[in-house]
Amino acid sequence: MFAFCKDNVTIGIIRVIAIFVRICYICCMTTYIKSPFPYAGCKYPLLEELDKEIPAGDTLVDMFGGSGVVGINMAYKFNHVIYNDIMEPLVFMHKNMYLDPLDTVLQKARDLSSKIPEKYAELRNAYNNLIEEVKLMHYHDTDERWKEVGYRFFGLMLSCTNNLVRFNRKGGFNQTCGKRQLTDPKVAEITLWKQKLDEIAPKMQFFSQSFEAFDGLPDGTVVYADPPYSNTEAGYNGGWTVDSDARLAKFILEHMNHKWVFSSCAKDGSTTKLVDTLVACGGFTERRIDYSYKASKKTKESKIEEIILVSK
């Protein structure tokens, strides 16, 4: 374990950090486990507010799972948790951390992460070539090549600029190399995340499907929906458009037998047609929360208003 550490002192530091964070999590109800991957749109800053709105139940579906912080931190309320995201590499990255031993995950982190631009570019090219192959050949999701896709994406997420996912128009990963390296605190974050996944493993399922594939959920299922933003052209939104918003609004309104918790950000007070449609139907209570968000040390802090809708 921790074979890549230089000496026992480093090992001790990592363990102390992980234990300290774990104690904080157990002892303080307002402390939540942070994802080691600050994925764009991550709802970690809002977990305390979302915790107030997401009711306990049998099954939680995190329909647009992203970083996974909502489903994993809310798992204590449910017997079953479904993580779903349309982006397959992201799902397989999470599945690898869920299925593989901690030693394997950390060794992969050591082998694949790099702040050396040439090594990073080599990994990025290898990832883009492999993802193109598995999609072209329609490999089954149990194929080992999908597992490797997940780990290569893992390495890119650890190393890319600000951990922000960016794709070109052909779907290739094109974010630049960052200046981060695999620090002891980052290893501790990965360790804590993995330990939490191990704890809730019997509850977890992972899918990469369109939201429309969840047509047959049992009555009373709690569904958390934080879709990509159609009002952005960012490369991480997976081609989500205003038409996608319209389809999701229709799906939600046709499935009000579920308990919906919906969130979306509003910059400068603007909302999407999706939010307006749900509010207009009269079937949701609405909360607006102001919070600050900073994507990186170099970016200015932005004031964002988060809209939370909860079905009545």
Question: What kind of feature is each model-predicted range?
Answer:
Residues I14-Y44, L102-Y224, P228-A234:
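SAM-dependent nucleic-acid methyltransferase catalytic core
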Residues C42-A56:
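Conserved alpha-helix/loop element of class I SAM-dependent methyltransferases that forms part
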Residues Y44, S67-V70, M87-L90, S159-N162, ...:
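Short, solvent-exposed loop/turn segments at secondary-structure junctions
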Residues T59-N125:
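SAM cofactor-binding core of SAM-dependent methyltransferases
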Residues N79, D198-M204, G282-F284:
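A short helix-to-beta-strand connector/capping loop
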Residues T241-K312:
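Long, positively charged, glycine-interspersed low-complexity recognition regions
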